[in-house]
Amino acid sequence: MHANAAGHCIDATKLDELHRYANAELASIDFNSNMYDVDFERLAADKDIIQLVFDVAQHEDVWGTGCPEPKIHIKDLNFNHNDIQIMGKNKDTVKITKFGVSYMKFHAKDLIEELGQHTEIKMNIVGKMNLNEYFGNVTPQIFIDSYDIMDGNLAF
């Protein structure tokens, strides 16, 4: 035995009833929503993300019909309000900078509202990699397509 172990059992004669119940209750759920085919997966603190963005950006002329732009899944991006900038004419663009990478979301009123509900934030992100060049400075960016937010104070 080990701590927090749990188990359940069901009488074999009740399996058909369980299947009918589960099928009825879960029929309206699309289990493929929020599913993404990603090409890369990294923890936010992984040191190779910057180089990966530079490497992928070298091939940006390849993406198009029949060759989709690669996506990356970033796990465990932990940050606070000091790492966030709200930008743009309409103040609806979010820029989160952490570990030398800028995570960008445009038209992000909902995200801005969600971020305001927490002091410490943990996010998982799916996005596309990009390089931003501004006055000779090149910054690796990830444009956020989808995200999950958790209260960073409760995450471990």
Functional labels for PLM-detected ranges:
Residues 1-156:
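Acidic, two-metal ion nucleic-acid-processing modules in DNA metabolism proteins
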